[in-house]
């Protein structure tokens, strides 16, 4: 069985248009088979976008696991900023580039297996992480983020209570100044500051 966090060229393409409105920002996306949440913006990502707080529009942002691009494109549109976006999935990167053009935003989207192709540090890393990769890889994603954050840089993520939000928060507090910003229907929005 194929997953959205893998490259599978055998998945038949079936592109569709998705319309999204978050915090009065209207966006249009092309989604496809083989990417996460292909039928519409998922509740966890929506909750993350409704809560993420970028206080400096002159900052650097990385969207980790960008899928077809809703997080990075939304942040680029809202804050009028260039966002770097990564995913291991080639189809996701291609969709992100199409969607950036469709929404008239500046992003830099590229393939990366976790942080293998990330060479700089960011003020913000924002993610709805791929929980289904398993705890070991999930923790690698979240704890290696520290090496790609500037001092006082922030990791923002969403995770469901049923997917281990409470235990993850305990573990994040060992490496970051981490806390819950908001909870909504079992989804935790976590902000982890690299200090």
Where are these predicted regions, by residue range?
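A short glycine-rich, Lys/Arg-flanked "PGG" loop and its adjoining helix->strand segment in the class I
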Residues: 139-151
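Conserved SAM/SAH cofactor-binding pocket of Class I
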Residues: 44-127
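N-terminal auxiliary segments of SAM/dcSAM-dependent transferases
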Residues: 1-22, 34
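Conserved SAM-binding loop and adjacent beta-strand
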Residues: 32-50
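Class I S-adenosylmethionine-dependent transferase superfamily signal
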Residues: 75, 144-145, 172
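Conserved beta-strand signature within the Rossmann-like core of class I S-adenosyl-L-methionine
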Residues: 152-159
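Conserved class I S-adenosyl-L-methionine
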Residues: 160-175
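Core SAM-dependent methyltransferase catalytic element
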Residues: 183-195
